[in-house]
Amino acid sequence: MPIVKRKPTSAGRRFVVNVVNADLHKGAPHAPLLEKKSKSGGRNNNGRITTRHIGGGHKQHYRVIDFRRNKDGIPAKVERLEYDPNRTAYIALVCYADGERRYIIAPKGVKAGDVIQSGDAAPIKPGNALPLRNIPVGSVVHCIEMKPGKGAQIARSAGTSVQLVAREGQYCTLRLRSGEMRKILSECRATLGEVSNSEHNLRSLGKAGASRWRGVRPTVRGVAMNPVDHPHGGGEGRTSGGRHPVSPWGTPTKGYKTRSNKRTDKMIVRRRNKK
């Protein structure tokens, strides 16, 4: 997939860098696998902002993705690759031998016409989904379940992958891209290979409006606000904020640890790498 830097025919095009994939389907998505997607503007049922920097953006349909990959023993042919506005990875429309169609996260290297499969007896090749106990140690996988049958939760973004480094008893040890080592039940499923669109991080939106198309609103610094809006607000002229960096609600930020999920700490063998 080539990286295309646009000619600066206008100020808004000057810094645009796009990832162009000629293999993507140019028509409409598969209608039976679409669902309505309404926008919240970051508000809850009381109308209050619960998530900042959300609002506007282009209308979208949600593509129903098969994260469980539980149609075992039935081969499926990849009909086409598609763009999905709801995620960074590409998606693949697959047609099973019994005629059912499903969307899956497109693995890197999988193209139209390829045949994929899921289940214990599936061959070891990119795009096939198997329980971790059937995958060779050292393999690169993505779309990994954290609970058997729940559906993939780990490594679903563009270009991501996880390495299976060990198998002991009923658990497998995985090395995540962050450097974290984590135990997962061997019954959980994973898809072989890495996620498509690995050059996604090289793109440049080029202008503020491109973020607005995606429903992302501006981020305002606390020191630019009034005291009523932020702990760093107020003061005459430019100020430093007057205290250690905090969120609008007073919680320390920039490295302050907030994770308190002790229940799953025992599954983490090694913490992620420090930035």
Swiss-Prot record:
PANTHER family: LARGE RIBOSOMAL SUBUNIT PROTEIN UL2M, RIBOSOMAL PROTEIN L2. SUPFAM superfamilies: Nucleic acid-binding proteins, Translation proteins SH3-like domain. Transmembrane segments: none annotated. One of its GO terms (cellular component) is large ribosomal subunit. Keywords: Ribonucleoprotein, Ribosomal protein, RNA-binding, rRNA-binding. GO terms for biological process: cytoplasmic translation. InterPro entries: NA-bd_OB-fold, Rib_uL2_dom2, Ribosomal_uL2, Ribosomal_uL2_bac/org-type, Ribosomal_uL2_C, Ribosomal_uL2_CS, Ribosomal_uL2_dom3, Ribosomal_uL2_RNA-bd_dom. Belongs to the universal ribosomal protein uL2 family. This is Large ribosomal subunit protein uL2. Disulfide bonds: none annotated. It comes from Saccharophagus degradans (strain 2-40 / ATCC 43961 / DSM 17024). Coiled coil: none annotated. Pfam families: Ribosomal_L2, Ribosomal_L2_C. One of its GO terms (molecular function) is rRNA binding. Part of the 50S ribosomal subunit. Forms a bridge to the 30S subunit in the 70S ribosome. Residues 28-54, 223-275 are annotated as: Disordered.
